[in-house]
């Protein structure tokens, strides 16, 4: 059974529906490739998939150890190749993990390894550079 239904809307745009939940998103070609840039581009969604997979997979494993990662945040930068063929050359992820209390070094190392081995990370082509920076911060009382 299909997971996603995609309609081509014309003018380099698509409408995408997640069939299980009914959630809907649109895509648009980027401005540097004839689009308007008014929605995520397909390559933006690849970069987004890596970031969301990293934090979701880390949170699954953190939860097993009683560690809450709510309040953590990522900034994702997608860098396109300057030479043909057009492709994503690099995805930079700046991840701030906020938790209280901070986990011990062994737990941090185990969780950080997940950033490089989540399902999306290991599914992407090896020529696509994945630059992941992780910083740990103690969560404030409002977040923890």
Q: Can you describe what each PLM-predicted range is?
A:
Residues 53-54:
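Alpha-helical metal-binding/catalytic segments enriched in His/Glu/Asp
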Residues 1-48, 59-144:
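Extended beta-strand/beta-hairpin segments
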């Amino acid at each position: 059974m299909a997971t996603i239904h995609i309609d081509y809307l014309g003018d380099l745009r698509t409408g995408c529906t997640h069939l299980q939940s009914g959630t809907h998103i649109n895509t648009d070609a980027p401005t540097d490739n004839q689009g308007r840039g008014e929605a995520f581009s397909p390559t933006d969604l690849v970069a987004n998939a890596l970031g969301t997979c990293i934090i979701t997979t880390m949170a699954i494993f953190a939860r097993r150890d009683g560690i809450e990662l709510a309040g953590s945040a990522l900034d994702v930068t997608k860098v396109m190749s300057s030479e043909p063929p057009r492709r994503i050359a690099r995805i930079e992820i700046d991840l701030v993990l906020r938790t209280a209390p901070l986990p011990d070094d062994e737990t941090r190392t185990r969780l950080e390894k997940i950033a490089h081995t989540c399902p999306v990370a290991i599914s992407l082509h090896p020529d696509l550079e994945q630059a992941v920076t992780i910083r740990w911060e103690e969560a404030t009382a409002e977040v923890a």
